Amino acid sequence: MNKNNLIGNYTIALFNNAMVDNIQDKVFEEITSINSIITDNVDIREFLFSPIVNKNDKIKAINSLAKNTKINTIVYNFLLLLIKNFRMTILSDIISVFNKLLCESKNIKIVQVISANKLKPKEQEWIKSHIEKELNQKTEILFDIDSNIIGGIVIKYDSMLQDYSIKGSLDKITKVLKKVNINT
């Protein structure tokens, strides 16, 4: 089974379990929090991701983590399932897909906005309001930074790409100039 199918299957199972009790938001919040603890702590991450560490020791670690964070039974059982099946390494990917499912269930479109520098909160709000107005839909904006675009922004959602960057403009100009045949 390829990795994307595997991630999709685990995510759908988790999402459906959360839907039964109508706690999708809570499950997302808890599993994201647990993932942050794991990714922020190198020792925990290496311990849980290591194929050498005994499965029972990993389960004890999850039990301890669950006790300290008071996580929901669904999240707890899901983490145990990942441990038992040696799948903890795909937790971040599962969370990403879970977020997409959560947004789809609320009719919220996920939009990625790439800028050359970190945008100020007012700029982020302005961009969000204009995108929501253009799409006539609520959005969740993921702001990323890529200094290669030089300036401006690039907006991505679904299969759409709107390039308002300086690099994009320069690339278009370069493409046009290459097409122009200059004979002297």
From Swiss-Prot:
Subunit (UniProt): F-type ATPases have 2 components, F(1) - the catalytic core - and F(0) - the membrane proton channel. F(1) has five subunits: alpha(3), beta(3), gamma(1), delta(1), epsilon(1). F(0) has three main subunits: a(1), b(2) and c(10-14). The alpha and beta chains form an alternating ring which encloses part of the gamma chain. F(1) is attached to F(0) by a central stalk formed by the gamma and epsilon chains, while a peripheral stalk is formed by the delta and b chains.
UniProt keyword terms in alphabetical order: ATP synthesis, Cell inner membrane, Cell membrane, CF(1), Hydrogen ion transport, Ion transport, Membrane, Transport
Membrane topology note: Peripheral membrane protein
Gene Ontology MF terms in the entry: proton-transporting ATP synthase activity, rotational mechanism
Primary gene name: atpH
Localization (cell): Cell inner membrane
Function statement: F(1)F(0) ATP synthase produces ATP from ADP in the presence of a proton or sodium gradient. F-type ATPases consist of two structural domains, F(1) containing the extramembraneous catalytic core and F(0) containing the membrane proton channel, linked together by a central stalk and a peripheral stalk. During catalysis, ATP synthesis in the catalytic domain of F(1) is coupled via a rotary mechanism of the central stalk subunits to proton translocation. This protein is part of the stalk that links CF(0) to CF(1). It either transmits conformational changes from CF(0) to CF(1) or is implicated in proton conduction.
Protein family per UniProt: Belongs to the ATPase delta chain family.
One CC-aspect GO term: proton-transporting ATP synthase complex
UniProt name for this protein: ATP synthase subunit delta
InterPro entries the UniProt entry points to: ATP_synth_OSCP/delta_N_sf, ATPase_OSCP/dsu
